Amino acid sequence: MSVRVARIGKPHGVRGEVTVELFTDDPQARFAPGSVLSIQHARGGRRGQGSAADAREPLAVQSLTVTGHRWNKDVLVARFEEISDRNAAEAARGLELFAEVADLPLEDDEWHQDDLLGLVAVDLTRGEARIGTVKALIQGSAQDLLEITPQGGGRTVLVPFVEEIVPEVDLDRGLVLVSPPPGLLELGEGE
């Protein structure tokens, strides 16, 4: 299994460097020289029909090997063995980069985003009563949110993914333990 770690942005200069939109918490490790990342075309990326991007030849490779990276203000600029000039950098624009899960070590209290999908959310304030199933993890600037599809159907519930409200994720049992403040789970009811 692989997880998305970044998306290639616009070219930076004429020597094949590209900007990178990050989806990882550890860019130093993911973009270390020698790291190999598999590629996929982004869904709904900038390669819209009729655009100049349509005329670009796609890269004829399935993976990219990192040769280096640097920071330009708060933007990661990366170099890859397979991208040697601005034309190749332009052809790579919009590609999504993936790393194998086995290459992404985790601490004891960490998990990959995809591991959360499909877990059963239970309410600790009601004796582990089933709330529903985790549908998505929505990443936000202030905090992440778990989108939970209620067991009985209806409108999805958004639960702040913070330790005070979600004290534990138990992958072995397939559970997300939720300790909601009064009224949180009722916000989506009645619509």
From Swiss-Prot:
Oligomer and partners: Binds ribosomal protein uS19.
HAMAP family associated with the record: Ribosome_mat_RimM
Family: Belongs to the RimM family.
Function comment: An accessory protein needed during the final step in the assembly of 30S ribosomal subunit, possibly for assembly of the head region. Essential for efficient processing of 16S rRNA. May be needed both before and after RbfA during the maturation of 16S rRNA. It has affinity for free ribosomal 30S subunits but not for 70S ribosomes.
GO molecular function, one term: ribosome binding
Domain characteristics, as noted in the entry: The PRC barrel domain binds ribosomal protein uS19.
Protein name, as recorded: Ribosome maturation factor RimM
NCBIfam families in UniProt: 16S_RimM
GO biological process terms on file: ribosomal small subunit biogenesis; rRNA processing
GO cellular component: cytoplasm; ribosome
PANTHER family according to UniProt: RIBOSOME MATURATION FACTOR RIMM (PTHR33692:SF1)
Keywords: Chaperone, Cytoplasm, Ribosome biogenesis, rRNA processing
Domain of life: Bacteria
